[in-house]
UniProtKB/Swiss-Prot annotation:
Its EC number is 2.3.2.23. Signal peptide: none annotated. Pfam families: UQ_con (PF00179). Pathway: Protein modification; protein ubiquitination. GO terms for biological process: protein ubiquitination; response to gibberellin. This is Probable ubiquitin-conjugating enzyme E2 17.
């Protein structure tokens, strides 16, 4: 287990629980366009369906995100990973890890899961190529099985795709 996985098993703080219940209710009434929450009784782990935007490389494609909320959410960012198969994208590794600054260094407690989802959809929609990251094989080789992407020291060097 990773430290991030272990922290999600500790349970949520009262602040995190209240915030997630509020976000859950918002998702029930007005989910972000292109996303659907799969019903679960686990407030800490959500499965989100991502639907590709018409007119983009990912049109008519559906992917699944696994979102794990840490015990101190929203003070800490959730862990967001594409489940297999992950989309072919220059910022999405074959193991589902996503190189997107709002999931790591640029996270703010004012953000919500819906803002992360919109960033992911924007990233997918603006891509001009379907390909793995250039360092995909190297990353997978050095990424221990089950390791949280939050343990990675990401270098955000390209925001063009």
């Amino acid at each position: 287990m990773t430290s991030s996985s272990e922290s999600t098993r500790k349970g949520l703080t009262k602040i995190a629980t209240n915030r997630l219940q509020k976000e859950f209710m918002e998702w029930q009434t007005n989910p972000p366009s292109g996303f659907k929450h799969r019903v679960s009784d686990n407030l800490q782990r959500w499965i989100i369906e991502v639907h590709g935007v018409p007119g983009t490389l990912y049109a008519n494609e559906t992917y699944q995100l696994q979102v794990e909320f840490p015990e101190h959410y929203p003070m800490e960012a959730p862990q967001v990973i594409f489940q297999h198969p992950a989309p072919l994208h220059p910022h999405i590794y074959s193991n589902g890890h996503i190189c997107l600054d709002v999931l790591y260094d640029s996270w703010s407690p004012a953000m919500r899961l819906s803002s992360i989802c919109l960033s992911i959809l924007s990233m997918l929609s603006s891509s001009s190529v379907k390909q793995k990251p250039k360092d995909n094989d190297h990353y997978l080789k050095n990424c221990k099985h089950g390791r949280s992407p939050k343990e990675t020291r990401w270098r955000f060097h390209d925001d063009k795709v």
